[in-house]
Design a protein with these regions (language model features):
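Gly/Ala-rich phosphate-binding loop of Rossmann-like dinucleotide-binding domains
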Residues: 50, 54, 216-221
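Glycine-rich flavin
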Residues: 2-35, 51-58, 63-199, 227, ...
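Beta1/beta-strand and adjacent pyrophosphate-binding region of the FAD-binding site
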Residues: 28-45, 199-209
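FAD-site-proximal beta/loop scaffold in flavoenzymes
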Residues: 183-200, 285-362, 446-450, 454, ...
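Short hydrophobic core segments
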Residues: 38-40, 146, 161-171, 205-206, ...
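Flexible, glycine-rich terminal cap/loop adjacent to redox cofactors
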Residues: 4, 40-45, 52-66, 78, ...
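Residues forming the Rossmann-fold NAD(P)(H) cofactor-binding site
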Residues: 47, 213
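A Rossmann-like FAD-binding core segment of flavoenzymes
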Residues: 103-104, 140-143, 147-155, 222-324, ...
Length: 506
């Protein structure tokens, strides 16, 4: 069983966090004779499953070996977004002169205070995921290592929990990339980077996915020299290439050195500094750093669960094998969240947990594939997406029409000085059925839900053109894309008919 990192530093905020999500004085309850659900893992999927099932009257046990709240609360969404907000505050002051505001001297970052703020926010939010709160919701909380011991039993230390159904929600963890010398040199991951108390002079981020891009921008704005290394030809390989280009330009303006088509070959140490050797076009390049942060590489937490004993198939890279109903190969056992799903987001774990509750407790047949899943990368600007992109539509052989509104044509974006970005909506050719959208804007994550709602409700782009948006808002870009669809329907023949009618009625 792997050793989880210690929560550092030892201050009042982390003490409050631990008191909520892994109380040192916690006593596991006496187990019930039998549970409707035993949930293994108290990240987002586990917490939502446990609370939802208990709220419906089920007898539920929830087992967690480390910290309730999982990655999202402790080493993911919450601390990273706190850091990003501080970084954005710095950038706003830095760029204030663009708005006619003169700052007497260059803004300075107190990195220790930034991290202290993050820990304070995290401890405050942790009350929502606390052991005491879930106990009061009617969930039996067991702190300890869990493993299956029989067809309907789970062992937690010396305690046996008997279940009718079980749910595996143990999540995933960062893993070292196969880079020669990396382990010996040492590296940071999302599990350790938020324990920093002093600013890094030089940071290399390996991996240009969401985490890598977000933290590269944050640390650069907070005063570190940052190099972002990506093996593929674009950042955020899953995203629209136009969106990735805008983000690359934004990162470079902030001072991030972006290295695309660069493969990390090995790490060496010389005179106390870490040297990352890159394979790039035309040869090799060496980047010196104080620390290396891995922004790529995840592995499912399947070890120690004794899944073989209950016939649950799994892959050490992809996780627990599930069908569209989130059933494992043992029909009494389900899984949800990062342990089994390709889309490793907090909100998809939440949605999957709701599917599990219906299917495991009420003979439901809710399908994972029926979900419409948006996501957002919280850089500045943000990149939000839902449904298909142009590449995915082409791969699936789906003919599409694309309607794009540059933010440079949106009054609020111009007034805010945030006019770099766009709204791009894809519809099935010959119809107004929305199949996907990408938004690049400072608050794209807040905007994408309008398109997601339309897709879930089967509302076409034509209808969005009739929705009155307050003026001025950046969300008007969505209506403008819908207006472009409407104009496309005005064929020469229709326009000629309109002209003849108007001439006749003049």
């Amino acid at each position: 069983m792997r050793k989880v990192p210690e929560v550092l530093p030892h201050d009042e905020h982390n003490a409050a966090l631990i008191a909520n999500v892994h109380p040192p004085d916690w006593t596991n309850p006496e187990p019930a004779p039998r549970y409707n659900l035993v949930v293994l893992g108290a990240g987002t999927a586990g917490l939502v499953t446990a609370a939802g099932a208990a709220g419906l009257g089920a007898k539920v046990a929830l087992v967690e070996r480390h910290l309730l709240g999982g990655d999202c609360l402790n080493v993911g969404c919450v601390p990273s977004k706190s850091l990003l907000r501080s970084a954005r505050a710095f950038a706003d002051v830095r760029d204030a002169e663009r708005f006619g505001v003169n700052v007497p001297k260059a803004p300075e970052v107190d990195f220790g205070a930034v991290m202290e703020r993050m820990r304070r926010i995290r401890s405050r939010i942790s009350a929502h995921d606390s052991a005491a709160r879930f106990r009061d919701l009617g969930v039996d909380i067991f702190l300890g290592e869990a493993s299956f011991s029989g067809p309907d039993t789970v062992e937690v230390g010396d305690t046996t929990l008997r279940f009718k159904r079980a749910v595996i929600t143990t999540g995933a963890r960062p893993v070292a990339l196969p880079i020669e010398g990396l382990a010996e040199a040492g590296y940071l991951t999302n599990e350790t980077v938020f324990s920093l108390t002093e600013r890094l002079g030089r940071l290399v981020v390996v991996g240009g996915g969401p985490l890598g891009c977000e933290l590269a921008q944050a640390f650069c704005r907070l005063g570190s020299e940052v190099t972002l290394v990506q093996q593929s030809p674009q950042l955020l390989i899953r995203e629209d290439p136009d969106a990735a280009r805008i983000l690359t330009d934004a990162l470079q303006r902030d001072g991030v050195r972006v290295k695309l088509n660069a493969r990390a070959k090995k790490v060496s140490v010389s005179d106390g500094e870490k040297l990352l050797h890159l394979e790039v076009a035309g040869g090799e390049e060496v980047v010196a750093a104080d620390e290396i942060l891995l922004g790529a590489g995840r592995a499912p937490n399947v070890e120690g669960l004794n899944l073989e004993a209950v016939g649950v198939q799994y892959d050490t890279r992809k996780g627990v094998v599930v069908n569209d109903y989130l059933e494992t190969t043992n029909k009494r056992i389900y899984a949800a969240g990062d342990i089994c799903m390709a889309y490793k987001f907090t909100h998809t774990a939440d949605a999957a947990a709701r599917i599990v509750i219906q299917n495991a407790l009420f003979l439901g047949r809710k399908k994972l594939s029926a979900l419409t899943i948006p996501w957002c990368t919280y850089t500045d600007p943000e990149i939000a997406h839902v449904g298909l992109g142009e590449r995915q539509a082409a791969e699936k052989g789906i003919p599409i029409d694309t309607f794009t509104t540059p933010l440079a044509q949106v009054d609020r974006a111009i007034a805010d000085g945030d006019d770099e970005g766009f709204v791009k909506v894809l519809v099935k050719r010959g119809s107004d059925t929305i199949v996907g959208a990408t938004i690049v804007a400072r608050h794209a994550g807040e905007m994408i839900s309008e398109v997601t709602t339309a897709m879930v409700g089967k509302v076409g782009l034509k209808t969005l053109a009739t929705v009155i948006h307050p003026y001025p808002t950046q969300a008007e870009a969505i209506r403008k894309a819908a207006d472009a669809y409407q104009r496309g329907r005005l064929t020469p023949r229709v326009k000629n008919l309109f002209s003849r009618w108007l001439e006749w009625t003049r």
